[in-house]
A protein has these predicted regions:
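Conserved nucleotide-sugar donor-binding subdomain of glycosyltransferases
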Residues: 69-103, 110-111
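A nucleotide-sugar donor-handling region in carbohydrate enzymes
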Residues: 134-211
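C-terminal amphipathic helix plus adjacent low-complexity
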Residues: 317-354
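Conserved nucleotide-sugar donor-interacting segment of glycosyltransferase catalytic cores
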Residues: 93-150
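A short, glycine/small-residue-rich beta-strand->loop->alpha-helix junction that serves as a flexible
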Residues: 7-19, 213
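Conserved nucleotide-sugar phosphate-binding/catalytic loop shared by glycosyltransferases and other
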Residues: 9, 27-28, 32-83
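Donor-nucleotide binding loops and adjacent catalytic segments primarily
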Residues: 22, 182-259
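A donor-sugar binding/catalytic signature common to diverse glycosyltransferases
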Residues: 104-108, 125, 249-292
Length: 354
């Protein structure tokens, strides 16, 4: 089986989930081409060495400001989106690595539905949201583009969604799967590598390198509580915060931590839920996907949710509260990549027999 992966975002969660599925398929003998933009690089570190990475940007881009989405600048970027999208589709329809694929898997590049129809190939999407939903949440001025993307998505053969996905009724032919998270190394090994004592509390700051989060780094006084050790997955100008030695092994550090403080990205959420780690989500404005993630988790006691600006004013009070508040820490099943691989083989077999 030749399988083409189209990953629409260079962020942590998208790449990790799709890489887990690609590695599982490769383990079963599939030939994989993984198309993504990978400046971190992350995919190159976690993908099976036999998987070919095709380094190309896959369309959707949100312009960020202070952690949230800059709606006006994003809209300016999207003014010619439909034309750019159709040019991308035309290019893909004539690309050998696309023509040679037996099946397409995406996280969700909604235009993959057009490729599926035009090339008569099955396409599977695995995601917890869609871009057309997110654009509509941002502002009604994105409606034309949202309608276009929704039409593209209708060509998807099957849509696999993990727990706490949003607006499931918008997915074509939806099927539930479990969380997708990498298997971490043992907690005690990582804490020993990081030189964390048994009586110390390891806190991961996983929010990205935006100006707001750099302000958070600077708001922390390491001398206020010598029991706390702070790590981050981002560059930091604060001497109070240590940088994780290997960002592509963030799952190991999350598993070894006592508390994760994040902006509510689904990749970080998946790992805290899979490993049973306490989670403090700091909500930012103009970030619909993360805000919805936070609201869903708060309702089921899987995370504490507070306003990001509150943390700037009283970081240690919120840290103490999140370390002591009642929270559902039972680890959730995280074999969704195995379930996804099963679905992909089943869909291809069914398609081939028609």
């Amino acid at each position: 089986m030749n399988c083409l992966f189209l990953v629409s975002d260079e962020g942590y969660g998208h790449t990790v989930r799709q890489s887990c599925i690609a590695n599982e398929l490769a383990k079963r003998g599939a030939k994989i081409t993984f198309q993504c933009r990978d400046p971190i690089p992350l995919a190159t570190k976690i993908l099976n060495k036999n998987i070919k990475i095709y380094n190309q940007f896959n369309l959707v881009r949100l312009v960020k400001q202070d952690g949230g989405v800059d709606v006006e600048r994003t809209y300016n970027f999207f003014k010619n989106y439909i034309t750019i999208s159709k040019d991308w589709i035309k290019y893909m329809l004539n690309s050998p690595h696309v023509l040679n694929a037996d099946i397409i898997v995406t996280d969700i590049v909604e235009e993959a539905g057009i490729l599926s129809n035009e090339l008569n190939k099955p396409t599977v999407a695995i995601s917890h949201f869609t871009w057309h939903w997110l654009l509509r949440e941002l502002d009604q001025m994105f409606e034309e583009i949202a309608q276009y993307l929704e039409t593209c998505l209708s060509g998807i053969s099957e849509f696999l969604y993990p727990p706490f996905s949003k607006r499931i009724n918008q997915f074509p032919n939806p099927k539930p799967i479990n969380l997708i998270a990498r298997i971490p190394r043992k907690r005690e090994y990582i804490r020993e590598e990081l030189k964390i004592n048994d009586d110390e509390i390891l806190i991961i700051l996983a929010g990205g390198g935006t100006p707001v989060w750099r302000g958070i780094f600077n708001s922390i006084d390491i001398n206020k509580n010598n029991q706390f050790v702070f790590l981050t997955d981002s560059s930091t100008i604060s001497n109070n915060i240590k940088r994780v030695p290997k960002p592509f092994k963030l799952h190991d550090y999350i598993n070894a931590s006592d508390l994760v403080i994040s902006r509510g990205g689904y990749g970080t959420i998946s790992e805290t839920l899979a490993y049973g780690v306490r989670h403090l989500i700091l909500v930012e404005e103009n970030h619909p996907e993360a805000i919805e993630n936070a609201n869903i988790l708060r309702k089921v006691d899987h995370a504490m949710v507070r306003n990001l600006n509150n943390f700037l004013n009283e970081p240690y009070d919120l840290i103490e509260e999140s370390l002591n508040i009642k929270m559902n820490l039972a680890p959730m099943r995280s074999d969704g990549h195995i379930q996804a691989a099963d679905h992909i083989f089943k869909i291809l077999d069914s398609f081939s027999s028609e």
